[in-house]
Design a protein with these regions (language model features):
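Beta-sandwich/jelly-roll carbohydrate-recognition scaffolds of carbohydrate-active enzymes
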Residues: 1-234
């Protein structure tokens, strides 16, 4: 596993980045490299603004010799409301990580347990092909993104059983990290709003932001909540 060698599929409006398993099974290993993101052009979020900061509070007048003063948004450094307002606008809005989708391997499995890794990205087809071995069982994974919709599809072939883990983070608001705050479960929620034998719809609520995630699968499987904002498909 190379934290700088993650691969992505996307369509210009949506992108999904994977590790060597073809999904986002070990995201923490990539958090300091090229993170395993699921992001879209529409997926933005703002933290709560209980102080009611307004954009005009961060404007400052400058005279550039054009016969009139011009207003520009600035980062204020002096302590006080203007600094607090500029700090808030500096991180809001920010792009959302829409969710981690990883293989549900046996408990205790580490990345170092995975061997015989072979992975390629066919840029012409927009397909990631991943092969690896775990506990003597070979896994072959094909990962693609729909050309026109915010949708990914993965095919997993193996004699061993592997489910799918879905974890949803709260955003960090930072500019150079993996966009995942895993220590703020009280600030967002994920609920199953519809489920049948081969599909489910999840509702995500983060402050004033709401979006939905649709899941579809082939064969017999069950989606269940493992813990808050964490679901498993087995």
């Amino acid at each position: 596993f190379d934290s700088l060698a993650s691969l992505s599929v996307g369509n210009g409006e949506f992108a999904f980045t994977v590790d060597a398993t073809g999904l986002q099974t070990f995201p923490s290993m990539y958090s300091k490299g090229v993170p395993l993101g699921t992001q879209s052009q529409w997926g933005w979020h703002s933290f709560a603004n209980p102080q009611g900061y307004k954009s005009e509070e961060v404007l400052k007048a400058f005279d550039f010799g054009r016969g009139h003063e011009e207003l520009y948004a600035c980062q204020f450094k002096e302590e006080g409301r203007q600094k607090e307002a500029s700090d808030w606008f500096r991180v809001n809005p920010h792009r959302l990580h829409l969710g981690i989708v990883g293989l549900g391997l046996s408990d205790g499995v580490k990345a170092s347990d995975i061997t015989d890794i072979r992975q390629t990205l066919n840029m012409w087809k927009g397909e990631i092909t991943s092969h690896f071995t775990l506990n003597g069982n070979a896994f072959d994974v094909q990962t693609v993104c729909h050309p026109d919709q915010d949708m990914i599809s993965a095919s997993v072939t193996s004699r061993a059983h592997a489910g799918v883990n879905l974890r949803f983070p709260y955003p960090t608001g930072a500019h150079a990290d993996d966009a995942c705050n895993w220590d703020a479960n009280d600030k967002h929620s994920t609920t199953i709003v519809r489920q049948d034998a081969q599909s489910a719809v999840l509702k995500r609520v983060l402050d004033e932001t709401t979006y939905y995630v649709t899941l579809r699968w082939e064969g017999k499987a069950n989606l269940a909540e493992k813990s808050k904002n964490y679901f498993v498909l087995t």
